[in-house]
Amino acid sequence: MTEQAEELTASYYRCRRDERFLDTFYDGFLSKSPTIAQMFAKTDFKFQKLVLRQSLLEMLCFDRGMSGTREEIERLGLHHKELGVTPEMYALWLDSLCEAIKKHDPCHTPALEQRWREAMLKSIEEMIAVGASQVADRD
């Protein structure tokens, strides 16, 4: 594992130590858009937090180029497209994630945040591309 990958993994686990990390994320994310808040209106957040934990790990693994992760990211992209997630929502998601990391990772730095953004954008761009190709395939 590269030093940058180790740094992100360590940051992820530092954030996870604080049980409020995912609550902070969802509070911030849902407050950014009434449309997003409505999409989560009937969500079982206990389950959703488990899904997010797993998705974040998958995204970190995809950033490292680990085998088998592209398929999971593509599956996430298709699922999000079916739910009506737009590219703009991914940007709000990423901002909310970085805000939560800043609050809950005691070792946060601007450079670490930039690395998080780069790693997550790799997966986000893949998810958006898969969703766009799904729409193109229907046409």
What function would you assign to each model-found segment?
Residues 1-139:
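Globin-like tetrapyrrole-binding proteins
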